[in-house]
Amino acid sequence: MSKYTPSLKKHYAEVVVPELRKSRGYKNDHQIPKIVKVVLNTGIDSEADKNAIADVQRDMNAIAGQKTVLAKSKKAIANFKLRKGQIVGCHVTLRGDNMWEFLYRLIAVALPTIRDFRGIATKLDGQGNYNLGIADHTIFPEISLEGVKKHIGLDLTIVTSAETDDEGRELLRLLGMPFRRSSETPKPATAA
């Protein structure tokens, strides 16, 4: 009986690693950048009731494929009407096969369903990691539109072992991340 291997993980081992080794001239396998983890995060309205919190957590569990952790405020901030210990969001860290399956669903299914999608920004954080904001969680196939009471946004962080942005960008590009071409960069609005 053979062990199941996610298709994107197989693609990484069979296509991406040899391509990176050839293009970058890595001599050691440990030099080749890899995806370490994927972190999903969302905020919850501080005045949300328990049912709304449960709905957000249910949707995040479905998207991630594993249980999320509720984030609580560490201190009270009167201007934001925030009490210490109040639930302010939830997050989940994906590693291993869950991470590879999620990335495959993100790249192949979720991102292409965005209306007028022209690719995602190519900017990384300076250390080879990629951050992506998703405005509406209903782009994921695990979420049925009938059960959604409120649309939520997600923050997505892909942490890589790449030492530079160029290495991280090349790794993600070879994995199939649909980056925007440099000629399609949106122009800043000008004052009229």
Sequence positions of predicted segments:
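Ribosome-associated RNA-binding proteins
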Residues: M1-A192
